[in-house]
From Swiss-Prot:
Coiled coil: none annotated. One of its GO terms (biological process) is peptidoglycan biosynthetic process. Binds 1 Mg(2+) ion per subunit. NCBIfam families: glmM, PRK10887.1. The gene is glmM. This is Phosphoglucosamine mutase.
Length: 445
């Protein structure tokens, strides 16, 4: 059995596999694999988390398992997922581990690994960990145990790294920025980065209590940020998700700037334009058309930052991302980093001396509707003939004018129904029709 999904191991806390007992076994299994593959007698792992209350329990269990396997652990505390990736490299660790369920509600949690290079752990090592989980847990001789220490300057190290990706001769002195931290991992470091670069920062949702992460805030709920930017007379707004690997922005008029807009800015407005951009099957057709006009290459990957990264490496490109706000700039960071992505947009604003809304003038997304159909149990929509017939009928209706995309979430029991086309009302009607078809078939199944 494989416990690893598209983004590590994820689920509801207290239910397998997100339990303290499993986390202990996982830490031990991962520790045994790392000891076999490490040139060091006692390899080092860095361990961080977001602000979920359950993260503290999982952290204790994981570090106990790792220590029992003879691995040293550096505890980083609550920090963005990309910070863990960076510090894995900066501290010369053999691996990094993040406890987070990203944009999911507080009752979910997850565990994912980074390699020593700060990238997602190779599938081969995940498979080795899976095999090790089938074995009995046994304790090393006391002299061979590892131990855990807390890294007290982890926040400062990451803040300085983020600032290093912003041109040293630029500053943000003339900008007022509203930052929505989603009560998540960037609640402290996020506002600090922009303040230290000179911006006047209004911080929102930066008081995590362990249960309020992503609750009606952050990149998945930007409505209050849009309102706050206008109320504060700010130049722009920035919203992270719970682990700060996603970012969306808001211009001074309260208009949403999503991942497609950000990719458009980085690909067409920056001084150093990339050779190509990787989007996903969810990327708006308007982005593809705009990049073609700008003579910038464009390819689509499957949904998920690991697939975007894979396509970037295959093409030798550095810029890619998703409409949800996962933005990769591989010349700056090894993984999607919300703070660094926002800094790259701010760099373009400063170098062009333009407001955020001016950078997207003339770029208009095709009407697109995404309906998330939450189910009691996951099903494969393409295994049901009646649904396939509905999908085919919709594709024929939009032929040459739009597209549909029906896919299963890799992290939760959700079917995502996306419809895109040149007629907004038609798109809305068709998306709801297909979502209702999925719901009705799920009840039958």
């Amino acid at each position: 059995m494989s416990y690893f999904g598209t983004d590590g191991i994820r689920g509801k806390f207290g239910q397998m596999p997100i339990t303290p007992e499993f986390a202990l076994k996982l830490g031990f299994a991962a520790g045994k694999v790392l000891k076999r593959t490490s040139p060091k007698n006692k390899p080092l792992v860095v361990l961080g988390k977001d602000t979920r209350l359950s993260g503290y329990i999982l952290e204790s269990a994981l570090q106990a398992g790792l220590n029992a396997a003879g691995v040293y652990v550096h505890l980083l505390g609550p920090l963005p997922t990309p910070a863990i990736a960076h510090l894995t490299r900066a501290l010369h660790a053999h691996a990094g581990i993040v406890i987070s369920a990203s944009h999911n509600p507080y009752f979910d949690n997850g565990i994912k690994f980074f390699s020593s290079e700060g990238k997602k752990l190779p599938d081969s090592l995940q498979e080795e960990i899976n095999k090790e989980l089938e074995k009995d847990l046994f304790i090393e001789d006391t002299a061979n145990l590892g131990k855990s220490v807390r890294v007290t300057d982890a926040n400062g190290r990451y803040i300085e790294f983020c600032k290093s990706t912003f041109p040293y001769h630029f500053d943000l002195n003339n900008l007022k920025i509203v930052v929505d931290c989603a009560h998540g991992a960037a609640y402290s470091v996020g506002p600090s980065v922009f303040r230290e670069l000179g911006a006047k920062v209004v911080a929102l949702y930066n008081e995590p209590d362990g249960l309020n992460i992503n609750e009606n805030c952050g990149s998945t709920h930007p409505e209050s940020l849009q309102k706050a930017v206008v109320e504060h007379g700010a130049d722009l707004g920035i919203a992270f998700d719970g682990d700060a690997d996603r970012v969306v922005m808001v211009d001074k008029f309260g208009n949403l700037i999503d991942g497609d807009h950000i990719l458009y800015i980085l690909a067409t407005q920056a001084k150093n334009k990339p050779a190509g951009v990787v989007g996903t099957v969810m990327s708006n057709m308007a982005l593809e058309v705009a990049l073609e006009k700008a003579n910038v290459g464009f390819v689509r990957a499957k949904v998920g930052d690991r697939y975007v990264l894979q396509a970037l490496e295959e093409n030798g490109w550095v810029t890619g991302g998703e409409p949800s706000g996962h933005i990769l700039t591989l010349d700056k960071s090894t993984t999607g980093d919300a703070i660094i992505a926002a800094l790259q947009v701010l760099t373009v604003m400063v170098e062009q001396n333009k407001a955020l809304h001016e950078l997207v003038n003339g770029f208009k997304l095709y009407p697109q509707v995404l309906v998330n159909v939450r189910l009691e149990q996951m099903l494969d929509p393409y295994s049901i003939p009646a649904l396939v017939a509905e999908f085919n009928k919709a594709e024929e209706q939009l032929k040459g004018r739009g597209r549909i995309l029906i896919r299963k979430s890799g992290t939760e029991p959700v079917i995502r129904v996306m419809v895109e086309g040149d007629n907004e009302q038609e798109v809305k009607t068709l998306a709801e029709h297909l979502a209702n078809a999925v719901r009705s078939q799920a009840q039958v199944a």
